[in-house]
Swiss-Prot record:
GO terms for cellular component: cytoplasm; microtubule. It comes from Tetrahymena pyriformis. The keyword Hydrolase does not apply. The sequences of the two genes coding for beta-tubulin are identical. This is Tubulin beta chain.
Length: 443
């Protein structure tokens, strides 16, 4: 079957990952000891997308946990599903990366990377037909960003034809955890543009907003934030794990969402988001789901899709619903808001329907959109980067680990190129065909 190898790196990646495994285990009826207690054969039918079956009928996540310090992993191990993971798959150092991308990518991380790759190989060899890798990490710290991107490039070398999907937490505009975030994030994006197939962009501020505004939580914790992310993550691969009328997988997603190879940074959303108390009063309809799914407040990254245009989008529905209704709603959205979709890609929304809804819901939908508005986020990071880099602030921490200023300059210009590519396609119309061809001839 189509297996996925899950890798989580750094504090953020491990916390999101731990939450994700709680959600997935719940969907498949796996308890914290790895035993199956479900009520439907469908839960077991394709459980091997995410789990290996061990002796005595135990199910073990195909997950690799890596970090440069033991702290977060100890808390994962002590957490509710900590005993589920394979002990050999915890790979950690003792030194920490200290929020320094260079430590994660070139020094500390480089020493640990081979032991991580051994575990990755071992998991990949146990697969019948490996679909790809999914990685959860943040771009603001040192391990998830530096070592995460190092791992991505190494895995890319060894498995060039497998899909590499990342769930990357980007530094938020207002909530900053570390001063050097813009450096770490820019250096990471520089890597992700080249080596990843699909990047789902998440940021904490947008998640906080969803918790405050929509879920009416007064004091959201990281646990609440990570729960939102894992709901969307589970939706992306739901079609691989449960039967459906219209299937999708990581590769189909990539083919339908990426019109140009570098533009693979997606916004994700999830609907229905209702506060815990008011859940039982709402029967959701497909039009309501569609409405909420395209709502800017629903996006898990702080970029407003109304400021750009969708190149492509994908709606992954879950639950029993009529295919006809889904198709009608998708057409409806495109016709009514046609100015928000580029006209030179007709029918640019892909939909898929999976029969099994998430726990506690009749219907749900995960939204993945490739919008040119995501450039707002890169612009924001680039401005902060330039402000510091112009004065060479904090640079000695990076050059001290053997990095060169050149690498910063390259990363900066790569990110600026990315922004202008998004802008170019946002402004493009169907009539300008001739001009594009001439431009490409000159390059």
């Amino acid at each position: 079957m189509r297996e996925i190898v899950h890798i989580q790196g750094g504090q953020c990646g491990n916390q999101i990952g731990a939450k994700f495994w709680e959600v997935i285990s719940d969907e498949h009826g796996i308890d914290p000891t790895g035993t199956y207690h479900g009520d439907s054969d469908l839960q077991l039918e394709r459980i091997n997308v995410y789990y290996n079956e061990a002796t005595g009928g135990r199910y073990v996540p195909r997950a690799i946990l890596m970090d440069l310090e033991p702290g977060t992993m100890d808390s994962v191990r002590a957490g509710p599903f900590g005993q589920l993971f394979r002990p050999d798959n915890f790979v950690f150092g003792q030194t920490g990366a200290g929020n320094n991308w260079a430590k994660g990518h070139y020094t500390e991380g480089a020493e640990l990377i081979d032991s991580v790759l051994d575990v990755v190989r071992k998991e990949a060899e146990g697969c019948d037909c490996l679909q790809g890798f999914q990685i959860t990490h943040s771009l603001g710290g040192g391990t998830g960003s530096g070592m995460g991107t190092l791992l991505i490039s190494k895995v890319r070398e060894e498995y060039p034809d497998r899909i590499m999907e990342t769930f990357s937490v980007v530094p938020s505009p207002k909530v900053s955890d570390t001063v050097v975030e813009p450096y770490n994030a820019t250096l990471s994006v520089h890597q992700l543009v080249e080596n990843a197939d699909e990047c789902m962009v998440i940021d904490n501020e947008a998640l906080y907003d969803i918790c405050f505004r929509t879920l009416k939580l007064t004091t959201p914790t990281y646990g609440n934030l990570n729960h939102l992310v894992s709901a969307a993550m589970s939706g992306v691969t739901c079609c691989l794990r449960f039967p459906g009328q219209l299937n999708s997988d990581l590769r189909k997603l990539a083919v339908n969402l990426i019109p140009f190879p570098r533009l693979h940074f997606f916004m994700i959303g999830f609907a229905p988001l209702t506060s815990r108390g008011s859940q039982q009063y709402r029967a959701l309809t497909v039009p309501e789901l569609t409405q909420q799914m395209f709502d800017a407040k629903n996006m898990m990254c702080a970029a407003d899709p109304r400021h750009g245009r969708y190149l492509t989008a994908s709606a992954l529905f879950r639950g029993r619903m009529s295919t006809k209704e889904v198709d009608e709603q998708m057409l409806n959205v495109q016709n009514k808001n046609s100015s928000y979709f580029v006209e030179w890609i007709p029918n640019n929304i892909k939909s898929s329907i999976c029969d099994i809804p998430p726990k506690g819901l009749k219907m749900a939908v995960t939204f993945v959109g490739n919008s040119t508005a995501i450039q707002e986020m890169f612009k924001r990071v680039a401005e902060q980067f330039t402000a510091m880099f112009r004065r060479k602030a904090f640079l000695h921490w990076y050059t001290g680990e053997g990095m060169d200023e050149m690498e910063f300059t390259e990363a900066e210009s790569n990110m600026n190129d990315l922004v202008s590519e998004y802008q170019q396609y946002q402004d493009a119309t169907a009539e300008e065909e001739g001009e594009f061809e001439e431009e490409e001839g000159e390059n």
